[in-house]
Design a protein with these regions (language model features):
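Hydrophobic helical membrane-anchoring modules
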Residues: 210-230
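Short aromatic/hydrophobic "clamp" motif used to bind/position activated sugar donors
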Residues: 102-104
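Hydrophobic packing residues within well-ordered alpha-helices of enzyme cores
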Residues: 18, 63-64, 121, 141, ...
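N-terminal glycine-rich phosphate-binding loop and ensuing alpha1 helix
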Residues: 2-60
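Residue-level signal for inorganic ion chemistry
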Residues: 9, 35, 92, 106-107, ...
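Conserved N-terminal catalytic core of the sugar/cofactor nucleotidyltransferase
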Residues: 36-99, 180-183
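Conserved core of the sugar-phosphate nucleotidyltransferase
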Residues: 112-204
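Short aromatic/basic micro-patch
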Residues: 28, 112, 167, 212-213
Length: 230
């Protein structure tokens, strides 16, 4: 029997760059709300035992309704987000089952995640304690100064575009949260919390299709990918 894994779906962010009033988690993709695809992937992964969704207060009932309408029975709680990503995840952590041994933390606005990718990164975390999906970088990346002048060029072979889910052994992640202190608001992903305390994280091969809905062009790309999977 596998360890108890709680998925924490972070869906509390706004949609300023989308230029829409609604939460981007509800953007229709082939006439279905984006978060529906996200929730279904975790529902269908046998390694995931429960799903906790972190959202804005005004979105909570809508998310519950989507779960009920689609038979997504693993959703155990829908809780309010915080002032930062880390605080939102902490709220999710506090709502998980006490039996949880691992947290699989995922962006609600990454609806193209697959069951196979979830399984791959969770199984890696079983072995190492901390793992994330990531893809190789194809563009040349430059480090610039405050005046937008190039300072250096990191080796592309050492760069990864990190995705979610990011999966951590529960005690490790809770310890990292406790040690984040006042810097919590500066963390844009959960791996950064572990990095901050010197922890090691395995990067598992991800898929470039696992995009995050950020700008309007992402909607077109996401729908094209979904059509290709039919």
């Amino acid at each position: 029997m596998s360890a108890y894994v709680s998925a924490i779906i972070v869906a509390a962010g706004g949609s300023v760059r989308m230029g829409i009033a609604d939460s981007k988690q509800f953007i229709p993709l082939l006439s279905r709300p984006a978060i529906e695809y996200t929730l279904k992937a975790f529902q269908n992964c046998h390694l995931i035992k429960e799903i906790v969704v972190v959202s804005r207060e005004q979105d909570k009932q809508r998310i519950r309704d989507i779960a009920v309408e689609n038979g997504i029975s693993k959703v155990s709680a829908v809780v309010n987000g915080g002032a930062s990503r880390a605080e939102s995840v902490r709220n999710g952590v506090n709502a998980t089952n006490e039996k949880a041994k691992y947290y699989a933390i995922h962006d609600g606005a990454r609806p193209l995640i697959t069951v196979e990718e979830i399984e791959r990164v969770v199984e890696a975390a079983f072995e190492t304690g901390a793992a994330t999906l990531g893809t190789s970088v194809t563009d040349t990346i430059k480090i610039v100064d405050g005046f937008n002048k190039i300072e250096s060029t990191p080796l592309r072979s050492q760069l990864r575009a990190v995705q979610t889910p990011q999966v951590f052994e529960c005690e490790l992640y809770k310890f990292a949260l406790e040690n984040a202190g006042d810097n919590m608001i500066n963390y844009t992903d959960d791996c950064s919390l572990i990095e901050n305390m010197g922890g090691e994280i395995e990067v598992v091969k991800g898929n470039v299709e696992n995009i995050k809905l950020t700008t309007p062009i992402d909607i077109i790309i996401a729908e094209s990918i979904l059509k290709s999977r039919m």
